[in-house]
Amino acid sequence: MSHHKKRVYPQAQYQIAEGIAQPIVGGGVPPQTVGAGQPQFLTPAQQHLHQQIDQASNGIGNMQLHNVPVVDPTAFQQAGTPVQQPPYGGAPQYGQPMNSGYGADNISGVQQQYQQPMQQPYGQTYGQQQQQPQYQQPGVGMAVGKPMNQLYPVDLFQELPPPITDLSLPPPPLMLPPEKMIVPNDTVNNCSDHLRCTLNAVPKNNSLLKKSKLPLAMVIRPYTKLTDSECPVPTSEDGVVVRCRRCRAYLNPFVQVIENGLRWRCNFCNLANNFPQAIDMNGNRYERPEFNHSVVDFVAPKEYAVRPPPPSTYAFILDVSQASIKNGLLATAARTLLESLDTIPNHDERTRISIICVDQSLHYFRIPLDEEGDNIKMYDVADLDEPFLPSPTGLLVPLIEARSNIEKLLTSLPEIFQQNIQPRFALASALKSALNLIRAQGGKIIVVGATLANVGEGTLHKRNEKAVANTSKEASTLLNTGDAFYKSFPIECNKYQVTVDMFMASDDYVDIASISNLGRFTGGQTHFYPGFSALNLIDVTKFSKEFSKHVSMDLSLEAVMRARGSSGLKMTGFYGHFFNRSSDLCALATVPRDQSYVFEIGIDEQLTKDFVYIQIALLLTSNAAQRRIRVITIGIPTTDKLTEVYASADQLAITAYFAQKAVERAPSSGFEDTREFFNKSVQEVLATYKKEVLTSNTGGGAPLMLCSNLRMWPLLMHSLTKHMAFRSGIVPADHRAQALNNLETLPLPYLIQNIYPTVYSLHDMPDEAGLPDEETGEIVLPQPINSTSSLLERYGLYLIDTGLDMFLWIGGDAVPELVTDVFGTPDIMEIPIGKNELPLLDATEFNLRVRNVITKIREHDDVIFYKTLHIVRGASPSEPMNHPSAREVASLRLWTASQLVEDKVQNSWNYREFLQNMKTRISK
């Protein structure tokens, strides 16, 4: 603990309404209704079910604490009356500045709105009660003998501001009784990090699904860490892989053991299968991972491989054109790759590397093995139409055997091309050459470029953005592929098990919409660094950290992913970065560890059983030269009641589904149509809920009702209309295309944060925030606040986390003490704005705490993103009009304001207006 004195910064403290009503979170079973009207459970397995339900009930009770603010009544006085704060650590209290436009008598309209909660446009506060229409009571219509999630309706207007802590709650539980498991335990049917279903109670027929207006889909994330050593899943290593003879489903915790353990009945197709004798060779079969876990890895026997496991192979294509030399990208990439050689996956010591440099010609390097000397030769190939390999050997070399010479080459690359003034970049020819080089093994082609592909096959051209910006033709003109090569080449890559990853860093147009297809259909990814300059340490840090983590993530090759559903279910749609090889098979040349996928499910016949099952199987070759199968299996109850469908809906997974559908339709339908797609989807659900779930027909003056487990979903859908990918207004084409690309691949937690940014109030954060927890040692983060300007004080300090970037907003009327403690200068006009880092100030603990919060937010081992910090200065009446940074500051303020998604962005509604519009629509 630092010896520095703590400070207190100005903040408003007011009385709020008493008698706060705690909303109830949906997706659980209240204790008072468990087993109501049901027979007593007597068997041990059924007793275990009681315990499971009790735990779920207790969890729901605990969740309630997160849905309302915890308020100390003694900390508030009369509403609207500022009070003196207690001393903070003995330090002198910072007074509020009383200059014009900021004093108590001259406060801004936004601040007045925040200081008077009883007059908020969001309607009644939590303490106020309102007569509500009748609705289905919890427990009504429950299936006898089968516990289900229950419905807890809420008024969305009463839930304003929306309780954002709901975004971190788990989904409604999968209510599967223990007798449906071979070995009941907590690791069976508990894999929401890997697999989430939009509906945790599946409608028994397609008509009920259509009636609900909710989608049935899965959000899949096969790997949750970048490396296998982090959180490994249970593994069956004896080579015994048991599958159903008919449907080919894998043995899982939900099969039925029959005939005294000699056979098992498949839970997908109901076929009886024999157990192989080998299943008992290593002891008790019921201790095997596949009986005890929903997520399990199998080391596959040789029958699962069509050829010996190939070595991990990387072909790096480096842009050496004038733009790449000028902005320092080549030097940065070469240095980063050099520093990452130790972390490139090489578990079996067979990893191979090739380096090709490109401008208007192709520059190959023949790298000798270290034992053969250090004479590295460069071959220049100018034939772009039919590029050829200039040497039969030495172009693709083992990392471990040519390490010294690879280091020598990477060190010398910037010097070799430092005088290059060629403006052209033959991307397509380089890609074809790299594919020709590694086609025998498969692997990855990683492109680092700073220039639009402008010569040879696959030439792209700048598009006239100004002519179509913010018009109905914008999407079709700017987002469609500019050349057919970028759709045909990925097909060739899939034939040879090759993935393409793109790292584009430029301050000019590079046509992300076209080149992103290279990764989209090969299981790869496109990363974009607009305005990159090696002279800016912030740019270098972001690129280096992300590029290094990308090449260091474990590499899995020759992968195929298949989804199975039990009788009556079929896969109808697939979304994500892969090649859809057949109706239910997705091919990934390599498996990315930081992406997720969405599979849509259809109901093609009446579901007659009480439970259905879904299984994801991913067959791949690991970097350790093992053929492995990752199997993920869950069981889901079925229902013929619409109330139970709604009570079990997962609002985050549903949002991911609609985001994928919107990404798919935007290029052809346009952005206005896509925004209306979000609005209409919410309207249909609210209308269905009002008509089919509420037991009385209510008039236009009634509340806007929805179940509590879906109460954040309208906010997320509304926020999507303001996302850079879909919003109206002028958005650069490359930025919009990259935003669509991110929505298509982000893992669910990062997707939600990218849709609804997390906002932290730092100037008034609790004493423990920003310091290590006494028990865990982890840095404590302050509680987030709603993403709205109505909560931002003009003298405050706020951090906005979008999942990809961070914005540190300092109010224009912040007192000099706060500015000094954070930035080391009392003059707010001297704060460095834009991409930057906070200075290290030894004289103030508050600076350390803020830096700790930023560092903690940047910590993650499941994606490669490094969040750039943008420092933004708020407006102030004393700000000079002709300040040199005025234009940059105005742009930063607009960008920051666009992250406050509960407010108006461009011509969109704020959230309350959106709900009012929905209410009007469904009342017609």
From Swiss-Prot:
CDD domains hit by this protein: Sec24-like (cd01479)
Disulfide cysteine pairs (residue numbers): none
Q: Which InterPro entries match?
A: ADF-H/Gelsolin-like_dom_sf (IPR029006), Gelsolin-like_dom (IPR007123), Gelsolin-like_dom_sf (IPR036180), Sec23/24_helical_dom (IPR006900), Sec23/24_helical_dom_sf (IPR036175), Sec23/24_trunk_dom (IPR006896), Sec23_24_beta_S (IPR012990), SEC23_SEC24_subfamily (IPR050550)
Any one Pfam family here would be Sec23_BS
* Topology term for the membrane: Peripheral membrane protein
Q: Name one GO cellular component term.
A: endoplasmic reticulum membrane
Q: Name one GO molecular function term.
A: zinc ion binding
Origin superkingdom: Eukaryota
Which positions does UniProt annotate for Zn(2+) binding? 244, 247, 266, 269
Q: Where in the cell is it found?
A: Cytoplasm; Cytoplasmic vesicle, COPII-coated vesicle membrane; Endoplasmic reticulum membrane; Golgi apparatus membrane
Q: Does the keyword Metal-binding apply?
A: yes
What's the subunit arrangement here?
A: The COPII coat is composed of at least 5 proteins: the SEC23/24 complex, the SEC13/31 complex, and the protein SAR1. Golgi apparatus membrane; Peripheral membrane protein; Cytoplasmic side.
UniProt family annotation? Belongs to the SEC23/SEC24 family. SEC24 subfamily.
PANTHER family per record: SEC24-RELATED PROTEIN, SECRETORY 24AB, ISOFORM A
Say what the protein does.
Component of the coat protein complex II (COPII) which promotes the formation of transport vesicles from the endoplasmic reticulum (ER). The coat has two main functions, the physical deformation of the endoplasmic reticulum membrane into vesicles and the selection of cargo molecules.
Its protein name is: Protein transport protein SEC24
UniProt source species: Kluyveromyces lactis (strain ATCC 8585 / CBS 2359 / DSM 70799 / NBRC 1267 / NRRL Y-1140 / WM37) (Yeast)
* Chain's gene name: SEC24
